[in-house]
Design a protein with these regions (language model features):
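Divalent-metal (Mg2+/Mn2+/Ca2+)-assisted nucleotide/phosphate chemistry catalytic cores
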Residues: 1
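Acidic donor-binding/catalytic loop of UDP-sugar-dependent glycosyltransferases
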Residues: 4-14
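Left-handed beta-helix
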Residues: 14-183
């Protein structure tokens, strides 16, 4: 899973209902550790919010994109979508959302930088924020974002630092990942 902090929230569901927005993305305050993650920007041409992943940023704009004072929020990968709005958008797009393709350069063996170079193609569901007029973001506590992207992250989540509550939520209390490097 990409975010073990994601879970249903009555408070967020009520907020989403009250806004009437077709799409809502949960965002959290970026720290220096989050500089390379996706963040929300406003499209100058359309005024819509869009998700911008670092691999989509032009090299000349990388420094500004990583500036956490200029772009203070990052995408937690938790979204809320009105079913009727999604149904209408899918009908408009012949059943396929036109999400941008993200191109990531990687190596076949991530532990060996000299292994064969490959290109990973992916889309991010959070990028759908740019498809709906009136999309919004809601700032959430850091505890709603517990990413597991590497074996190091999984090691931390499976350690005794975190525990599963009676309501099946991962809990730690401080929600700041220690730096762990496995051999």
């Amino acid at each position: 899973s990409d975010n073990l902090g994601a879970r249903p929230s009555r408070t967020l569901a009520q907020h989403f209902e009250n806004t009437g927005a077709p799409f809502m993305a949960e965002v959290a305050i970026r720290t220096k550790a989050d500089r390379k993650g996706g963040h929300i920007v406003r499209d100058k041409a359309t005024g819509r919010l869009i998700l911008r992943e670092m691999s989509q940023v032009h090299p000349d704009d990388k420094e500004a994109a990583q500036d956490i004072t200029k772009h203070p929020y990052f995408n937690t990968n938790s979204i809320w979508v009105r079913i009727d709005a999604l149904k209408d958008k899918l009908a408009e797009c012949d059943g396929v959302l036109p999400l941008p393709v993200i191109r990531n350069k990687k190596t076949v063996n991530p532990t060996d930088p000299d292994s064969e170079q490959v290109i990973q193609l992916e889309t991010a569901m959070g990028a759908a924020i740019g498809l709906f007029n009136g999309s919004i973001c809601v700032q959430v506590d850091r505890m709603r974002f517990l990413p597991v992207k590497t074996t190091n992250d999984l090691f931390i989540m499976r350690s005794d630092r975190f525990h599963l509550t009676d309501t099946y939520e991962m809990e730690d209390g401080n929600y700041i990942f220690p730096n762990v490097e496995l051999d």
